[in-house]
Amino acid sequence: MPRKPGITTKAREKAKPAQAVAKPAPEVAKLGYFVGKWATQGTILPGPWGSGGDFSWTETTEWMSGNFFVVGHWDFKMPAELGGDGEELFVMGYDTNRNVYSFDAFSSQGLHQVSKGTLSGDLWTWTSESIQNGKPVQQKMTMEILSPLSYNLKFELSTDGATWMTFMEGKAVKKQ
């Protein structure tokens, strides 16, 4: 004969220890700097990638439920020789096992970028690797926080890990 739920079953359920709710690591809170609406403008320098030109993007970034990750969306404008205009979805987080920040981005141009980041004082440094013309290229994005409402950025490329070429430089300004 099956047991009917009753006081005994309910008492057992209440006696179960409550599951600990996971809390974000303290480092995760630092990603909150990027939450909001941003406008970024800058210049792509001439180089092996082409003649360069102006770039811009608008960005909306928010906390994902649980406050472990920041999710964002960019609408960008680039010179046509570099792929032109598009959009990108990205997720930022912190890997407590590796003690490193993470950045995963997916663009409307079919690109997927995976970066690792560090924060030292007011300087964020993001590194990644891509394949260009069949060869590995190291990438480095530095973001120097100027104030709660702005930061400078610089994106560099290297084929040997020692010599870096500046691809683009710009400034981001928070709108909200």
Segments predicted by a language model, with ranges:
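Hydrophobic small-molecule pocket/channel-lining residues, especially in calycin-type beta-barrels
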Residues: 2-176
